[in-house]
Amino acid sequence: MLEKVRFDLPQDEIPTEWYNILPDLPEPLPEPQDPTGKSFEILKQVLPSKVLELEFSKERYIKIPEEVLQRYLQVGRPTPIIRARKLEEYLGGYIKIYMKMESHTYTGSHKINSALAHVYFAKLDNAKFVSTETGAGQWGSAVALASALFNIQAHIFMVRTSYYAKPYRRYLMQMYNAQVHPSPSEFTRYGREVLAKDPNTPGSLGIAISEAVYYALENGGKYVVGSVVNSDILFKTIAGMEAKKQMEMIGEDPDYIIGVVGGGSNYAALAYPFLGEELRKGKVRRKYIASGAIEVPKMTKGVYKYDYPDTAKILPMLKMYTIGSDFIPAPVYAGGLRYHAVAPTLSLLMYKGIVQARDYSQEEAFSWAKLFSQIEGWVPAPETSHALPILKEIVEEAKKSGEKKTVLISFSGHGLLDLANYADVLGFNKE
């Protein structure tokens, strides 16, 4: 008898609302701070007005505009849930593994979920263009496609080390007619200042954010935020809202929800619709575990305090786990994990002990990626691979308890454009 591995939600059952966790948090989220008195004014100028409004909304559910919903369908939503039956067998049969496959979107990752909303709202404001940062290129690719679909120009500031290490993501953005700049770049005043201090800098997401904000501010565009802030997480919860319906359809209730954190939007987008329900009931049964890169240990070695989300310190300060906005991470290939801080809502949940954190080295994560590819056939993005080592911990817990555990994992993107990076670390190029 055939065993089902793919679980699809019909297009006509796609969720029509985003979920906002703010009203369900265990305590109020600390307010942003503006020491200079200028940051809030800058935000009002550079963010789409509706995005800024939704950033502080206390409404639990927000209706998705029909124009955005239609384009969700166009780019591959709803995405399937895949059961990793062969990996379950390899790990001894102690756990059931369900993967929310955000790799199935047209750009190959979860990032398109919020890019469409941000760009749509920028278009409503009659923006001349949109600008944003990108690390590995996943967010940049998503903004490039969203901009093409809404017929508006995109300027993407790509962290310099990834710009050269991941040329195919750059080419994908250019296929969508985006203009892509290595960050720090000669294209902006701030970029030139950074390069003057260190011509060989690998760049950082903090620097790229600063360039994108300055460029929008000085040239009549709108800046679109790729992670961290509440509104971006809100837009991405379409993935978690779908997954909740799918798990109910399958007849499973996850014991663990796991995923990786760059700024936090990927993990939060999957986990929050499940966690919010538990917070409203006053009891959290599931285990929520988020992982990152040990080379950028903001979750495990960071401090929960107010810090700037960007290197130039032009945006309001947010209370979050951080290793410092000036931190320049090692040029690891999981570019999306190289951000210095964690989203304020996720930081609060970590601080309260509701969400646990883990960090893994590039070598360990990539070894798991190779194993996973051999067993299941899917090649995970370098970022996504950092969630896989959590499985060994869950297997040990299942062994001790004597109960089979169900895991839901955010398969946040594929690694088909990152094979050269895998080859470098795993030694494929050695004669």
Swiss-Prot record:
Superkingdom assignment: Archaea
Entry keyword set: Amino-acid biosynthesis, Aromatic amino acid biosynthesis, Lyase, Pyridoxal phosphate, Tryptophan biosynthesis
Cited function: The beta subunit is responsible for the synthesis of L-tryptophan from indole and L-serine.
Stated name of the protein: Tryptophan synthase beta chain 2
SUPFAM superfamilies given in the database record: Tryptophan synthase beta subunit-like PLP-dependent enzymes (SSF53686)
Presence of the UniProt keyword Lyase in the record: yes
Family label: Belongs to the TrpB family.
Cellular-component GO terms for this entry: cytoplasm
Pathway terms, separated by semicolons: Amino-acid biosynthesis; L-tryptophan biosynthesis; L-tryptophan from chorismate: step 5/5
Subunit field text: Tetramer of two alpha and two beta chains.
PROSITE patterns found in the cross-reference section: TRP_SYNTHASE_BETA
